[in-house]
């Protein structure tokens, strides 16, 4: 079962333009009540950017990265390779608050 806050390795290619590419960790933000659907909303993680108001920093394993909610996308389960962990409760709370703030502006 795929749950909100899970971190999955997701195959994002093919992409267009400035969309984040490659296979990379992504945090699931779809509510658990929608886990039966064949698509999930995910937020990619990256190590190649600077922290900003809308890109919260997270520690995942032994690495520090950034959540990139402005690159949130819907992906089919077929792109989701395997679960590699989960965000801490505080990180998920920050991510969801960031998304709310982005959409309120």
Tell what function each PLM region has:
Residues 1-105:
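Conserved functional hotspots at enzyme active or ligand-binding sites that engage polyanionic ligands
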């Amino acid at each position: 079962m795929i749950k909100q806050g899970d971190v999955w390795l997701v195959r994002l290619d093919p992409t267009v333009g400035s969309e984040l590419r490659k296979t990379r960790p992504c945090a699931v933000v779809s509510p658990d009540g929608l886990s039966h659907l064949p698509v999930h909303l995910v937020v990619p993680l990256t190590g190649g950017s600077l922290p900003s108001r809308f890109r919260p920093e997270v520690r995942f394993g032994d690495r520090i990265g950034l959540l990139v909610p402005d690159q949130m996308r819907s992906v089919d389960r077929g792109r989701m390779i395997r679960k590699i962990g989960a965000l801490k409760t505080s990180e998920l709370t920050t991510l969801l608050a960031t998304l709310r703030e982005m959409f309120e502006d």
